[in-house]
């Protein structure tokens, strides 16, 4: 398959329900903005890709992915969220379940709290994130096998410890920190907050 939705410049989702059940890259544009609605994507490459189209090459445009609200679930065989510029998540619930064959995961430059963890997930495994009081932050049934999980919701507070449960395995993770063995800023790395350059999840 090819891309699910593609725009040269701006792709904005303000509401409704969208399900890209099969694609190469599910959502692709220079600037991808999700403000509300329910968005679920499946892709053999990047889930959401912000990149500079040849038609805009002479305009010095800056790619960006911005999620301000809604419920976003991304299943990707490469990068879940791939911005060749800024990646910002300020609201809503975003979950990325990925294989991690590309440069993932990489974290938002600014925005609300998030957790990221390397996991071993089989299709149909129950995956959930709970806080220190065992209150559920997010829960889903994985629609595909995965090796990386990223979750951002308003309930997640940076610096707090959360528990990621995938199948029968549980792991503790601190919000706002890359998983052990994850990629940080630096030459050849995929960058953390403030590192500039591209942002991959």
Describe the role of every protein-language-model region:
Residues 1-201:
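A composition-driven surface/loop motif
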